[in-house]
Amino acid sequence: MTVLGATGKTGRHVVAQAVERGWVVRAAGRRAAGAGEFVAFDWDDESTWHPAFAGADAAYVVIPFNHAGAPEKAPDVIRAAAAAGVARIALLSTIDVDHAPDDDPTKVAEQTLLSLPVEAALIRPTWFLDNFTVGSFRGMLDTGELRLPAGEAPFPFVDTRDIAAVAVAALAPDGPTGPLPVTGPESVTHHAVAEALEAALGRPFRYIPVPAAEFIALLESRGFTHSYGDFLADALGKVANGSFVIPVADTVERHCGRRAYTPAEFARHFAQS
């Protein structure tokens, strides 16, 4: 199988879990991953696309939205995978893609995949717990204060290891296809996430609800753009006011034979690693 984004948040776990199954894994990208066989893949160089997929039975596709031009090229990459003979393709999507406009790149990528003569799995995760440790909010972990405009509403955050587990299940012969929502085992508040990390790391960490303007200014002070801060503040605000509610899904339990990881289990794993 071929894995795009093999060094990323989900891709590295897909590679590791597929290797654990004894599969031959091509870790495709511009640099070698921690496991798997490296194969060159560059979103800006179409000559690398076919060789990365040729001979693979399955592929995991991640769209790097921070790579200029990649979202627009995603349909062509997916078509290239199918043209190379890949029979099963799992696309990393998002939990709320059905509510996105028709020209949304993720929605277009999903529709492209579904139009092809392949077994298609749409991996639709909710927000990553990993965003608190290696993502946009990592700086807040270092200061001991998670300052977000998210109010007190609960949310079913997911561990990226669970996203990978569902993807690997979908890439197996006779694996599940179609939309696969991936959430944590329960909805929890940001207070609960902070408490889990505090307990695992053995140092103070608390959640403090703040106004959107303060949050945006905080992100700007750490090098993020105003537009990115405004985008996150809008999403968090919808959680706070109850207009963005995600039900807990049992996808991990149904297809992986175990329940999804809790925030406490995620935090302990992060602390140990």
PLM region spans:
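A hydrophobic C-terminal alpha-helical subdomain
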Residues: A213-S273
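Active-site regions of enzymes building and remodeling cell-envelope glycoconjugates
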Residues: A35-D44
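Oxidoreductase cofactor-interface core, primarily capturing Rossmann-like NAD(P)-dependent enzymes
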Residues: M1-A27, R31, D44-H50, A54-A56, ...
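Short phosphate-engaging motifs
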Residues: G34, T189, T262
